[in-house]
Curated annotation (Swiss-Prot):
Monomer. It is an enzyme of class 3 (hydrolase). It comes from Talaromyces purpureogenus (Soft rot fungus). InterPro entries: AB_hydrolase_fold (IPR029058), Cutinase/axe (IPR000675). It catalyses: Deacetylation of xylans and xylo-oligosaccharides. The gene is axe-2. Keywords: Carbohydrate metabolism, Cellulose degradation, Cleavage on pair of basic residues, Disulfide bond, Glycoprotein, Hydrolase, Polysaccharide degradation, Secreted, Serine esterase, Signal. Its main location: secreted. This is Acetylxylan esterase 2. The active site is at 117, 202, 214. Degrades acetylated xylans by cleaving acetyl side groups from the hetero-xylan backbone. GO terms for biological process: cellulose catabolic process; xylan catabolic process.
Length: 234
């Protein structure tokens, strides 16, 4: 009843009225929305991306978030047994579907991407294109719509296996690259929106031998990552 009255009132305002769809978007769409993608074998939800996801939510009251729904697996029975390659392919598709769908519903909402480990890899490919040849993913196109890319204001990747030292957005002590590192000369069209964190002792995003390093980026770089996001959101 109230919604019908509200709509009728708007229509009665004449040509100068704000379009109804625009009003409905303002009533239902947040100013900022965060997508989080978890690491391999993490339980459904945000996994270790939660540090930055929650930081953004706390810094911007009224902002919202959702987790990317994908296997996050590497063949382990605990995550359903999907191979890493299959999980990555499903993850890239899930990122594209979730972000593009949200953007079509809330085209004025600023978007933040936060991916940890495999979660960073799938977001990296979806946003930057270039494919993921080591995992058999040969589609090199950017998977997000141009409208969605425009509204992605910041992207944080932590422990991303596609890390390659020397790219403009790479941060940390790693001077090498991950097991799915980008090829020499790769250029991401959204490079200015990204910070990707990896340290030398990490065996997944770099060539180190300390697996514990891989789980420490939230505490090591969380504040720095949040500051970058804030600088991009304005």
């Amino acid at each position: 009843m109230h919604s019908k009255f509200f709509a009728a009132s708007l229509l009665g305002l004449g040509a100068a009225a704000i379009p109804l769809e625009g009003v409905m978007e303002k009533r239902s769409c947040p100013a900022i929305h965060v997508f989080g993608a978890r690491e391999t074998t993490a339980s459904p939800g945000y996994g270790s991306s939660s540090t930055v996801v929650n930081g953004v939510l706390s810094a911007y009251p009224g902002s919202t978030a959702e987790a990317i729904n994908y296997p996050a697996c590497g063949g382990q029975s605990s995550c359903g047994g999907a191979s890493y390659s299959s999980s990555v392919a499903q993850g890239i598709a899930a990122v594209a579907s979730a972000v593009n769908s949200f953007n079509s519903q809330c085209p004025s909402t600023k978007i933040v991407l936060v991916g940890y480990s495999q979660g960073g890899e799938i977001m990296d490919v979806a946003l930057c294109g270039g494919g993921d040849p080591n995992q058999g993913y040969t589609n090199t196109a950017v998977q997000l719509s141009s409208s969605a890319v425009n509204m992605v204001k910041a992207a944080i990747f932590m422990g991303d296996p596609m890390f390659r030292a020397g790219l403009s957005y790479e941060v940390g002590t790693c001077a090498a690259g991950g097991f799915d590192q980008r090829p020499a000369g790769f250029s991401c069209p959204s490079a200015a929106k990204i910070k990707s964190y990896c340290d030398a002792s990490d065996p997944y995003c770099c060539n180190g031998s300390n697996a514990a390093t891989h789980q420490g980026y939230g505490s090591e770089y969380g504040s720095q990552a949040l500051a970058f996001v804030k600088s991009k959101l304005g």
